[in-house]
């Protein structure tokens, strides 16, 4: 994108009222783009936003003066290699947007507005509660005090609110009630279309994602990678106990959907669960290519150069005829899109796959993904919130080998 006419990068500017779900959408977009290897910077605009709010009648010259430091900073950020910068403003006036357009154009930045609108009062109330309890700007204050501050700010911003319109001749997407209505105007490139596709899949429902590797397999016991081996005796015990621990973990089989890969060991692990099951080939384990069925010791002794390459850059290293972690992330993109639309889902699959999914929800760096510890016979519950993902773990008391390997 930066090679196009010397453009610095893409600035995605979120606008809309507080408690509309705007901040949640901005943070999720930042997490998604980072996970997809797009260098992304989420800019904290809170102080500027407050300044603009206190001077809501500022003329264009004063607006530009207030906003210029942000774009001066973004110019530096883009020159250091960032591809996308995300801004999150409560302002939604025509005068404000014109200033943003002029500042971005003067610095040769692509600009895309995202207006987030919520008309569902129940969702607005839930978002206000979430802000009071978890926002770094409100959680230190008494709940009622925070709530009143947020309600007052909504009232003030509503006075000057002007929705985006096609007459403005700028790139934008207007999202009403999380995809119930979607207006897209003047997209200019593939990345913008991917952003719209992702945002259109976001939902507000509170839900959890449960993760578990398959039960211990014969290949796990033998120290081999890849393959499509069956469960070991210990793995079969884990599968038999899984329904009991699903119940203990307050998952409940009613309304729960279980996703597995197409491989035998995950299907065997899920067979005692009395709920809807879906097989996804996209959840199959990382393809080890010509090394499939080998142990790590065998690879290091017989293919030392390959072992060294993988140890030096585990995320990008691709097995001959196989995959890298980066390939797996690309393969999992449709899974992530579907997870954003779903309710409670229990995913039973493989170590590399779960590392990538786990890393997405915890917003971990790509370099960290290949080293995340996802033990056998452990259930991980992830509950995504606006400002963090809450995690709980339960270990099922069936012993299993460890397949965790540290950095070399």
From Swiss-Prot:
It is an enzyme of class 3 (hydrolase). Beta-D-fructose 2,6-bisphosphate binds at residues 213, 220, 226, 296, 310, 314, 325, 351, 355. It catalyses: beta-D-fructose 2,6-bisphosphate + H2O = beta-D-fructose 6-phosphate + phosphate. Beta-D-fructose 6-phosphate binds at residue 157. ATP binds at residues 16-24, 127-132, 307-310, 351-355, 387. GO terms for biological process: fructose 2,6-bisphosphate metabolic process; fructose metabolic process. Keywords: ATP-binding, Hydrolase, Kinase, Nucleotide-binding, Transferase. In the C-terminal section; belongs to the phosphoglycerate mutase family. This is predominantly if not solely a fructose-2,6-bisphosphatase. This is Probable fructose-2,6-bisphosphatase C732.02c.
